[in-house]
């Protein structure tokens, strides 16, 4: 406890040791094609293969500093981004994001609920803090299966309260 009035839910060491983007490395089979890198060359190769990518800082959160690139994006643009953010996660862009993602809430290893987050018009970022809109949703059997796999692992690692995001059956 920080004070008599503040209770800490998640183990602080577990939170420190598991930044959300890096934690996902254990679940690459559930994700769209993804690389973790600080190399412009690696991102260029990845871009050549997948044409459209989203790049996120490995320690980013809240839908901030997300970069969309396509085949016409310059090497200089990527380099400038890497100079600012260093280590990044690059993923094949999923156009289904225009229809939103699902934020799934997990407490004590149990799936407690979900919301669908819809990006504001013209955006690929669905986070509510970045202008996204929350709407009621349910999970498909496959979404539930994916969430269950992650929920079980989070419980083993002493993360009591967490949210995970799915876009079109991908973590």
Describe these PLM feature segments.
Residues 1-42:
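Conserved N-proximal alpha/beta basic substrate-recognition cap immediately N-terminal to
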Residues 40-41, 48-52, 59-146, 154:
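Phosphate-binding site of ATP-dependent enzymes
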Residues 54, 105, 167-170:
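Conserved protein-kinase catalytic-loop segment immediately C-terminal to the catalytic Asp
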Residues 7-11, 36, 54-56, 89, ...:
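A structural signal for short, well-ordered beta-strand segments and their strand-loop junctions
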